[in-house]
Amino acid sequence: ETLDRSFEGWTPAVFEMLDRLRAEPHIDQYNKEKPGVTDDLKDPFRRYRDDLVVNWVLPNRLNFETEKHVFSRLLKNDFGAGGCHDHLWMSFYRPHTRRLEDVQITHRVSPDGFAVGLYVGAYATELLQQAKARIFAAPATYLDHVNRLLQDDDWYFYTHRGSGENETRTVFDAPLDEVPESVEGAEGIYLRHYISREETLALGAALVDRALDLVFEVWPLYRFYLADRDGQWGQ
């Protein structure tokens, strides 16, 4: 089935710009890049977002906020230090909460390429504790969800503690024999699929199709995290 798409694909220009922001992650470089930030990054990402809405959210009648504050910011909230990120990401969220306080199906563009995945943690402290409770109450079910993806290439499962220079990560790229010890003390849990820069460019507009396939892959785990003790899920 052909998707209704307005996104035309990422261009080499966006990755070259993000390369420069990675090399000089500061507001001065951001200001130099402002035209490209709009034309090469933000506007195409909005069209990509619109395609997800038209082809996934609306047909499935999903109760997601798709307009307000679904995108991250390039400029860091670092108390005036002027730092700048080298990536931009987005996630829809349930209307009664906020993007950073919900379980997130994330879409991320960076100098390395594009990534789609699932994250719980950071400001979503209550949902992280709920997810951990679900994991340890049904470890076999959890491993089934995770390993189904880890058996394929370019999927990574990792936990993290801390942030910035103090962040530590425990990373797995192959099926797990047991729930990692790092899960219990984790401040965030990721399951993410990476698409290389070269493949992202080659996909063009079809990145939307690939991304939706990946969304469907993580959807059972998204529901697992949000299910209550009786296994019931709802938005």
Task: Describe the residue ranges of each PLM region.
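Short histidine-centered catalytic/ligand-binding loop motif
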Residues: 34-41, 130-135, 203-207
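Surface-exposed helix-capping loop/turn segments at secondary-structure junctions
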Residues: 51-63, 149-150, 224-234
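Hydrophobic/aromatic-rich structural module bridging two neighboring secondary-structure elements via a short loop
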Residues: 58-104, 108
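Active-site acidic/histidine clusters and adjacent loop/turn architecture
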Residues: 19-71
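Long, solvent-exposed, polar/charged low-complexity segments
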Residues: 1-24, 45-48, 136, 155-235
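Compact, glycine/acidic-enriched structural inserts
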Residues: 109-174
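Soluble, non-transmembrane alpha-helical interaction regions
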Residues: 8-10, 74, 143-148
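Glycine-rich, often proline-containing surface loops adjacent to acidic residues and nearby aromatics
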Residues: 32-33, 111-117, 187-196
